[in-house]
Amino acid sequence: MKVLVADKFEESGLTGLKALGCEVLYEPKLEGDALAGRLAQTAAEVLVVRSTKVSAAAMEKATGLSLVVRAGAGVNTIDLVAASARAIAVSNCPGKNSVAVAELAWGLILALDRRVVDQAVDLRNGVWNKGEYAKARGLSGGTLGVVGLGSIGKEMVHRAKAFDMRVVAWSRYLDDSKAAQMGICRAESIFALALASDVVSVHLALTKETRGFCDAAFFGAMKPGAIFVNTSRGEVVDEAALKRAVAEKGVRAGLDVFEKEPSGATGTFEDDVVSLPGVVGTHHVGASTEQAQQAIAEETVRIVRVFKATGQVPNAVNLCHRPPATALVSVRHRGRVGVLAHVFGTLSAAGINFG
């Protein structure tokens, strides 16, 4: 099995893939037309990516491609519709970077509450201003609002208890019973959450429904001077509305993600939101700890191992996991003429309905 790794990837992961008997092509700077070309040239069966975009054009001539593994959680950089149309499975590594992202989110919260960045800049410029920086509000006794209660959101809740904070959360799948089990309060809406929270942390996957989710009405409901943190995807926030909230309500923002980010590891960053007073930004590195990347590498190897051995795809995001049928038949063959016809004929002869 030929595996093309088109992003930076842990050495242990490359070793693990080779140990499976895979032919590993490690080309961590592929993107755009170059990626499309290499997929066509190599006839790779598996593509592993982190931040590289996998477009419909990239998959169009990738005749050998059967599986795309996103070495991370979010899959918004992969054209799922195009992949599904070409019978290419897409898998991810959910939950493996949850602790890392939660740690950065809390780092941003603390940095905003204690104005750590402003203090560091003043000290570097030879300015001592203890009187100004002694005005921090503090976190203990306050309310943390968590928007999205997946694995990262749950890690946020766990750490909030150490800060003696009350937690109110909103999720489509959260009910009062689950909230009670977690020792938190369920918000009826994101607006109710915004009204109640001293700190809001967003942990949403980017979908058609969540694009621009935190909008003008949401920021209008936030408390003046509250803290807003986004470590999910830049597109879930209406940035113009956020800028107004910063300027008009003194909302402080910690952002690890932005709607327009450079496509590579380095580049020019032109989003002026980070120049606003009260805004702290980082370089979309929430998941980028050694611990998280090691866990993701191990999960990627596991996914390829299972796929190579059985044809099944762990963590598939574009396959139906619970079809209406009572059984699933998976046929792996070498493209020989008549194989599927024989299988279907055998099923029909046995009176088995299939689709």
Model-derived features: where do they sit?
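An N-terminal-biased, well-structured beta-alpha scaffold segment characteristic
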Residues: M1-S91, L195, D215, T266
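Phosphate-binding beta-alpha-beta segment of Rossmann-like dinucleotide-binding domains, i.e.
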Residues: R86-I88, P94-T143, S151, E155-H158, ...
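Rossmann-like dinucleotide-binding domain for NAD(H)/NADP(H)
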Residues: V90, R166, P224-C320, P324
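A conserved regulatory-domain signal marking ACT and ACT-like small-molecule sensing domains
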Residues: P314-G355
